């Protein structure tokens, strides 16, 4: 992926200087043309076209922002209500992620979401122990994490 991005930037600079338009518009035009040429010659690269991975990263960011907003609203409702009606709990989340950076990313996304905190990871790196501030159903929480964060991380890494 990094090689394709650097090659695309190199092609953009070549286009910008060969077309005698050293400006941001010339660079962007060269970048788009370079991206198209890399797309057409993608079968010569060992990895998939980098734009798909970039789209997956952007999708993961939007999922995190959405979950962050929803969790903030939920925590705000709990904190501002006159009667503190929460059900804190700890549940075990069995992850399908295998690489260390994937598990770290999942742990960070869960911890950065208000109301949840990854307390520990099992020695075999397959189970995350998560504390939730207000949890009604552990199975629903596991399903939500698996369908949002874990699925998006798998799209980025594979």
Curated annotation (Swiss-Prot):
Pfam families: MNHE (PF01899). PANTHER family: NA(+)/H(+) ANTIPORTER SUBUNIT E1, NA(+)_H(+) ANTIPORTER SUBUNIT E1. Mrp complex is a Na(+)/H(+) antiporter that is considered to be the major Na(+) excretion system in B.subtilis. Has a major role in Na(+) resistance and a minor role in Na(+)- and K(+)-dependent pH homeostasis as compared to TetB. MrpA may be the actual Na(+)/H(+) antiporter, although the six other Mrp proteins are all required for Na(+)/H(+) antiport activity and Na(+) resistance. MrpA is required for initiation of sporulation when external Na(+) concentration increases. Also transports Li(+) but not K(+), Ca(2+) or Mg(2+). Mrp-dependent antiport apparently occurs by a secondary, proton motive force-dependent mechanism, but the similarity of several Mrp proteins to membrane-embedded subunits of energy-coupled NADH dehydrogenase complexes raises the possibility that there is a capacity for electron transport that could provide a primary energy coupling option for Mrp functions. It is found in: Cell membrane. GO terms for biological process: sodium ion transmembrane transport. It comes from Bacillus subtilis (strain 168). The gene is mrpE. Its main location: membrane. InterPro entries: Cation_antiport_E. Keywords: Antiport, Cell membrane, Hydrogen ion transport, Ion transport, Membrane, Sodium, Sodium transport, Transmembrane, Transmembrane helix, Transport. GO terms for molecular function: sodium:proton antiporter activity. The keyword Transmembrane helix applies. It is a multi-pass membrane protein. Forms a heterooligomeric complex that consists of seven subunits: MrpA, MrpB, MrpC, MrpD, MrpE, MrpF and MrpG. This is Na(+)/H(+) antiporter subunit E. Belongs to the CPA3 antiporters (TC 2.A.63) subunit E family. The chain crosses the membrane at residues 21-41, 51-71. GO terms for cellular component: plasma membrane.
């Amino acid at each position: 992926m990094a090689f394709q991005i650097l090659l695309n930037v190199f092609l953009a600079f070549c286009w910008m200087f060969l077309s005698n338009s050293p400006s941001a518009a010339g660079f962007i035009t060269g970048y788009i043309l370079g991206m198209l040429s890399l797309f057409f010659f993608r079968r010569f690269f060992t990895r998939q076209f980098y734009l798909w991975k970039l789209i997956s990263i952007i999708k993961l960011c939007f999922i995190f922002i959405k979950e962050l907003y929803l969790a903030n609203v939920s925590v705000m409702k709990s904190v501002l209500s006159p009667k503190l009606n929460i059900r804190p709990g700890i549940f075990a989340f069995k992850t399908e992620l295998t690489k260390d950076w994937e598990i770290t990313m999942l742990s960070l996304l869960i911890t950065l979401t208000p109301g949840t905190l990854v307390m520990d990871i099992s020695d075999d790196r397959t189970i995350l122990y998560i504390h939730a501030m207000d949890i009604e159903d552990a199975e629903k929480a596991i399903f939500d994490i698996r369908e949002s964060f874990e699925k998006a991380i798998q799209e980025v890494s594979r």
